[in-house]
Each structure stands twice: as C-alpha cells, then as structure tokens.
Amino acid sequence: MSAFGLLILGLLTAVPPASCRQGLGNLQPWMQGLIAVAVFLVLVAIAFAVNHFWCQEEPEPAHMILTIGNKADGVLVGTDGRYSSVAASFRSSEHENAYENVPEEEGKVRSTPM
C-alpha cells in the first residue's frame, strides 16, 4: 500500500498548481441566489431525514388490558403498572361494562369560554 501512496504523491507533485484567479467567469447574482437556496433546502432535507430516523420513539399503546382476578379493566395510557383509582370510581354496580355519570360540583369543573 505504501508504493501506491508514493505513486499518488509523485503524481501530485508533478502536476502544476491550479490558480484560483483563472475561472470561467462570475455567476449572475440570481444564479448565486438560486444555488444558495437549493443548497439550503438540501441541507434542511438532510436534517429532517436524520431527525426522523435518529429520534424515532416507540409509539405508546392506545389501550392495554390489565387482568386482576378474573376481571379485565382497561389501563389508561401512561399509568402502566400503576393502579388508577380514577377509572374504578366510574364503574356501575348494575353492569360490569356500564359506567356511572357522577355529577360534579360546579366549583370543581373547569371550563373556558370559546
């Protein structure tokens, strides 16, 4: 591999240096702006793609079943592994799949005008 490196180094030293002052000409201002916008959009697209693939999170399940004894209750999202007494207070004593409408006191209900 060192012989290949020496060959490349010899070729680079044999080639005359390029001058930056010799060019094909300046671009028009509108062309420079167009190129700048295109480069910016490509960089933004790359940033979005990296963010999309790098920062993926597992979706939270919408509904889970927790079995206690022989009775299955729905578990609220975010209360995984913890007992939620909020859902238990809505259960009806007449039917296992029915819920009670518990009247709320007027002071405890928060509402905003639309």
Swiss-Prot record:
Chief location bin: membrane
Extracellular topology ranges: 1-28
Its membrane topology: Single-pass membrane protein
Pfam families with a match to the protein in the record: MAP17
Any Gene Ontology CC annotation: apical plasma membrane
Sorted UniProt keywords: Cell membrane, Membrane, Phosphoprotein, Transmembrane, Transmembrane helix
Record family assignment: Belongs to the PDZK1-interacting protein 1/SMIM24 family.
Function statement: Auxiliary protein of electrogenic Na(+)-coupled sugar symporter SLC5A2/SGLT2 and SLC5A1/SGLT1. Essential for the transporter activity of SLC5A2/SGLT2 but not SLC5A1/SGLT1.
Protein name: PDZK1-interacting protein 1
